[in-house]
């Protein structure tokens, strides 16, 4: 990897940060792991970018292009509706991607799709489709996500979705290295760059078509 995003589960997701804390303290605690990762990344030459994963009763969204300062000054994001979330994040120049949109698991009461309320969709999720994955492993989730993104003309992303030190190798290969979370948001939303997606096992073009080895 040239770089990674730290996208931990936020306030209504699976987080270890005490939800009873005042907003400012909660944000500092939530962002602390990112700074730890970034400090180590700086030592070894790995770019580390901030993001987070919001949760609406099992429906999850990956948020990019915002930072700790933005969270501190926008406490309304915590209880924002999905519609309000898109507006707030876009005003910052950020990006809202529907995470693993067609995954079916016990923690997801029902699959809810809202193509008009996102900037794109995660078409490739290594936790769903890599042979190394130890959870949620069903490649059909990715196949359906790709079909969904194509149907609604949504740009696609890819990621590992790891919750441990397991190295799945999922992600996106860009022609030029990213310089910030905002840069990532602009490249995905702009759809001008011919990037490729991977789950660590297979490669796909940005439209979700398999690239032969």
Language model feature labels by segment:
Residues 78-81, 92, 97-116, 184:
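Active-site-proximal loop/helix segments of hydrolase catalytic cores
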Residues 1-91, 116, 123-152, 163-169, ...:
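A metal-dependent hydrolase metal-coordination microenvironment
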């Amino acid at each position: 990897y040239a770089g990674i995003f730290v996208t931990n589960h936020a306030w209504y997701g699976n987080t270890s940060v005490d939800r009873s804390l005042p907003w400012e303290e909660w944000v500092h605690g939530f962002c602390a792991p990112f700074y730890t990762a970034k400090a180590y990344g700086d030592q070894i030459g790995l770019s580390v970018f901030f993001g987070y994963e919001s949760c609406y009763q099992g429906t999850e969204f990956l948020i990019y292009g915002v930072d700790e300062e933005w969270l501190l000054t926008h406490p309304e994001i915590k209880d924002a509706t999905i519609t309000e979330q898109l507006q707030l994040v876009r005003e910052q120049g950020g990006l809202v991607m529907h995470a693993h949109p067609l995954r079916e698991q016990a923690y997801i009461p029902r699959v809810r799709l809202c193509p008009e309320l996102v900037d794109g969709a995660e078409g490739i999720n290594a936790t769903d489709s890599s042979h190394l994955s130890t959870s949620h492993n069903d490649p059909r989730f990715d196949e359906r996500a790709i079909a969904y993104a194509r149907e609604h003309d949504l740009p696609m992303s890819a990621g590992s979705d790891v919750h441990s030190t397991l190295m799945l190798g999922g992600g996106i290969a860009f022609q030029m290295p990213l310089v910030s979370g905002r840069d990532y948001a602009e490249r995905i939303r702009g759809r001008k760059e011919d990037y490729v997606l991977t789950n660590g096992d297979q490669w796909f073009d940005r439209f979700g078509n398999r690239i032969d080895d």
